Amino acid sequence: MFNKFSKTFQYGRHTVKLETGEIARQASGSVLVSMDDTVVLVAVTVNKDVKPGQDFFPLTVDYYERTYAAGKIPGGFFKREGKQSEKEILTCRLIDRPIRPLFPAGFYHDVQVVATVMSLNPEVDADIPAMIGASAAMVLAGVPFMGPIGAARVGYANGEYILNPTKTELTTSQLDLVVAGTESAVLMVESEAQQLPEAVMLGAVVYGHEQMQAAIKAINELADEVNPVIFEWAPAAEDTELVAQVKALAEADVAAAFKIRQKQARSQALGEAWSKVKAALITEETETLRANHIKSLFKELEANVVRGQILAGEPRIDGRDTRTVRPIAIRTGVLPRAHGSVLFTRGETQALVSTTLGTKQDEQIIDALAGEYTDRFMLHYNFPPYSTGETGRMGPPKRREIGHGRLAKRALIAVLPKQEDFSYSMRVVSEITESNGSSSMASVCGGCLSLMNAGVPLSAHVAGIAMGLILEDNRFAVLTDILGDEDHLGDMDFKVAGTENGVTALQMDIKIQGITKEIMQVALDQAKEGRLHILGIMKSAIDAPQELSTHAPRLYTLRINPDKIRDVIGKGGSVIRALTEETGTSIDIAEDGLITIASVSAEGAEEAKRRIEEITAEVEIGKIYEGTVVKILDKNVGAIVQIMPGRDGLVHISQIANERIANVADHLQEGQQVRVKVLETDERGRIRLSIKAALADAPQV
């Protein structure tokens, strides 16, 4: 019934097993990947026919984490998984980025990759198994895919690289880097680091690429055993006559367009050049494939013009040389009521970045598959269509926005103050108001300055820069601070963020084979040069963290005996609720007894702090207190007197007066202020009070 194949290999300290032929047999290719109890099923499906009018490669990648994988039932009213989490979306992008450039130009068949996490070892993240599984399933689907690829996570601690570190190991690692590539070349890097030197970062990329060869070898061996059916597809034969026609119609216009420095005017000129080609070569009767081919030839012509100019040493599209950063303008304190804000403009890319400070209660609660946790630092990136002069849908963030926000967040994490030194939660929002390349790096620069404007004591300034590459045979040019067109027409998108001391985030996407270690070294060195230039400008705008905004909450902390926490909270939360309402504060209580009071008003916070100190103060035996009668007990037993907020004691009828009394109510009423002396507390914490003892101790007049 089943024709099963499997392949096992050692991957660092983990054992990885690839299985196929038993599950999801109707998919074009499917693989079950196991890595030390983390199990991911990856299925690839390819449509046999191209949709009419299709003019791009429709690859979709979806990654899902099922809660049963961790032995959990989803929380909330609906007991099933809902929309994808941020972690799932980021993993979709990790899988997609190294796979997409390995498909040939002109392949327009629908390809769908679905990765499902079915079992999770909390120590082994499912992203690396999912990437390996997607590569293997793609090979088994028989599509024209120039793979397989391998993927590896690299950590760095005590001067040594760690292959596929566990979750526990990552807590002490100075680096969390994911690298993917083919047998001969690196294709994708995603990382965050603790201000590491460029040499260490490059070494991690090379180390990861060397180690992933074990995964690539296993996939190839599995494919040899399975011997998959090859998908029938052949690239369109080169039509030299059509190439010549497109060139004759548009080359001069395209070359002239790329001499225009302003983006909108340049885009308009390129649009007119395309319209000229379209009018001459495409009619209503033209087949979709031919129309697509003409469009791709026009795009190829654009690339050839730009690339040829740069490799010939001519100025770039906007007139710069290869190493120059675009002009930068910085304005701080832009938004009067925001806790921190900065307008960061670099050429035609602009980000308006704001920072909001909050309390522990404002932290993001993340219900992850491996367990719930909170995050005190949030960075959200918004890319409205007006930023590129276009109209479009506004709504929930797209995958690209989530990915760019995560990259900017990675860049800043390394310089954030420790929780014990700065108790605030922090939310940074980057509104991209103009875009012509490198908006995520503008978010890094603006985010750093916005945090400092809000008074967050960052340990260093962080700047980010996007690098590009043009590679033809043995000639190459590394471009500093790339434009949007240079990103699309180049061979590499290489984003580096860091401080003066080292790299905090690195993201790389390579569209071609053949990027060598030497080229990456040149790119890193040139990126450092650009980063230091930007850091100098940023420091001239804000050289150190500023004073907290008057609109930001003030945090006050005190520590109490953990046994007293219940007294501060009160029965059913009555005490803390009254405290927050009456003082206008927000109060957070940690299990270790650390209390954080947040308030815009210093007076309210001080009052809350005073009352908490009263509540948690130890009752002293023999001390006299001013108390309030809160209850007259039935059967003439006595009265309950409150001597501190939340602390009551019993005054027995025999302790009310020196003489014998018959009725408690004749001497005491609820709300009456009385002086009482603490006689004793029992093992259950109950307090015995005496009015007559307090009278006896009163000074004689």
Curated annotation (Swiss-Prot):
Pfam families to which the protein is assigned, alphabetical: KH_1 (PF00013), PNPase (PF03726), RNase_PH (PF01138), RNase_PH_C (PF03725), S1 (PF00575)
Official protein name in the record: Polyribonucleotide nucleotidyltransferase
Subcellular location: Cytoplasm
Described purpose of this protein according to its UniProt entry: Involved in mRNA degradation. Catalyzes the phosphorolysis of single-stranded polyribonucleotides processively in the 3'- to 5'-direction.
One GO CC term, this protein: cytosol
Superkingdom to which the source organism belongs: Bacteria
Binding site for Mg(2+): D487, D493
Swiss-Prot/TrEMBL catalytic activity: RNA(n+1) + phosphate = RNA(n) + a ribonucleoside 5'-diphosphate
GO terms, biological process: mRNA catabolic process; RNA processing
Family: Belongs to the polyribonucleotide nucleotidyltransferase family.
Taxonomic path: Bacteria, Pseudomonadati, Pseudomonadota, Betaproteobacteria, Neisseriales
Molecular functions per Gene Ontology: 3'-5'-RNA exonuclease activity; magnesium ion binding; polyribonucleotide nucleotidyltransferase activity; RNA binding
Primary residence: cytoplasm
Domain named KH: residues: 553-612
Keywords for this protein: Cytoplasm, Magnesium, Metal-binding, Nucleotidyltransferase, RNA-binding, Transferase
Needed co-factor(s): Mg(2+)
Record-annotated membrane-spanning stretches: none
Stored PANTHER family: POLYRIBONUCLEOTIDE NUCLEOTIDYLTRANSFERASE, POLYRIBONUCLEOTIDE NUCLEOTIDYLTRANSFERASE 1, MITOCHONDRIAL
InterPro entries, alphabetized: ExoRNase_PH_dom1 (IPR001247), ExoRNase_PH_dom2 (IPR015847), ExoRNase_PH_dom2_sf (IPR036345), KH_dom (IPR004087), KH_dom_type_1 (IPR004088), KH_dom_type_1_sf (IPR036612), NA-bd_OB-fold (IPR012340), PNPase (IPR012162)
The EC number(s) this enzyme carries: 2.7.7.8
Stretches assigned to the S1 motif domain: 622-692
